[in-house]
């Protein structure tokens, strides 16, 4: 897994191409990310990775072991930690600051991890997209789940059965999104579309897209289309975030 960054979903806006085409984008703003700990196969950890942290925290909100961990590596107290598997940990050191221009550039494909919007208790039609029952001929259960099992054998409801329950507020990873533009002065990037998980001001983690062999051809086509967008972007276009 390559190096990524911890950021915040800000909101949506749009950018214009030279031919006047409007491209909807989501703004992701990054605080300063710190390398907290460097792990390698040559240490007791036994594998190559970087522990990255962001968003400064108050001491009263952290446990004593975590406070000691931050002080040991000479970094500020941080609220969010994430570990990225890397091939070159020797190029980094504890306390090093990571910024968006060091990791992402326009034209990249990225994967975005976040917590989806919580929608509370929901029925099967909303939660699982069930069709429901007929609306006519005296049917009494229009939005019900229907049968949930068999008979004496197996005599139970199968684990994983799609039923009503809590909808959303779960980890989601959206793959293969486009980086349209980078804003180094704001430490932010613009990602094409609105597919990022979670609400505005929610924490997201961006990583370079994992190359999946089955989708290699479509990924290359995506990158060609994205390169056209990047080359034809109107640089002077305002990127003010829309209020939501």
From Swiss-Prot:
Keyword tags: Ribonucleoprotein, Ribosomal protein, RNA-binding, rRNA-binding
InterPro entries, A to Z: Ribosomal_uL3 (IPR000597), Ribosomal_uL3_bac/org-type (IPR019927), Ribosomal_uL3_CS (IPR019926), Transl_B-barrel_sf (IPR009000)
Record flagged with keyword Transport: no
Ranges in coiled-coil conformation: none
Superkingdom of origin: Bacteria
A Gene Ontology term for the protein's cellular component: cytosolic large ribosomal subunit
One annotated GO biological process: translation
A GO MF term: structural constituent of ribosome
PANTHER family in alphabetical order: 50S RIBOSOMAL PROTEIN L3, LARGE RIBOSOMAL SUBUNIT PROTEIN UL3C
Annotated function: One of the primary rRNA binding proteins, it binds directly near the 3'-end of the 23S rRNA, where it nucleates assembly of the 50S subunit.
Record's subunit section: Part of the 50S ribosomal subunit. Forms a cluster with proteins L14 and L19.
Sequence similarity: Belongs to the universal ribosomal protein uL3 family.
Protein name: Large ribosomal subunit protein uL3
């Amino acid at each position: 897994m390559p190096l990524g960054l911890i950021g915040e979903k800000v909101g949506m806006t749009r950018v214009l191409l030279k031919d006047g085409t409007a491209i909807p984008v989501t703004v992701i703003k990054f605080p300063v990310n710190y390398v907290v700990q460097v792990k390698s196969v040559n240490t007791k950890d036994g594998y190559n990775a970087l522990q990255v942290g962001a968003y400064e925290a108050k001491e009263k909100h952290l446990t004593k072991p975590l406070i000691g961990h931050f002080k040991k590596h000479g970094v500020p107290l941080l609220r969010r930690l994430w570990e990225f598997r890397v091939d070159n940990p020797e190029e980094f050191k504890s306390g090093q600051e990571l910024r968006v221009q060091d990791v992402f550039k326009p034209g990249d494909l990225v994967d975005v991890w976040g917590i989806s919007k919580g929608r509370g208790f929901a029925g099967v039609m909303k939660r699982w997209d069930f069709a429901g029952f007929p609306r006519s001929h005296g049917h009494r259960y229009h939005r019900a789940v229907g049968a949930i099992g068999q008979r004496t054998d197996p005599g139970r409801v199968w684990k994983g059965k799609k039923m009503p329950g809590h909808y959303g507020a779960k980890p989601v990873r959206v793959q293969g999104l486009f980086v349209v533009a980078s804003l180094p002065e704001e430490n932010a990037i613009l990602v094409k579309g609105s597919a990022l998980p979670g609400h505005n001001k929610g924490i997201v983690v961006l990583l370079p897209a994992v190359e999946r062999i089955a989708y290699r051809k479509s990924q290359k086509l995506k990158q060609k289309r994205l390169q056209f967008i990047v080359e034809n972007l109107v640089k002077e276009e305002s990127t003010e975030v829309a209020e939501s």
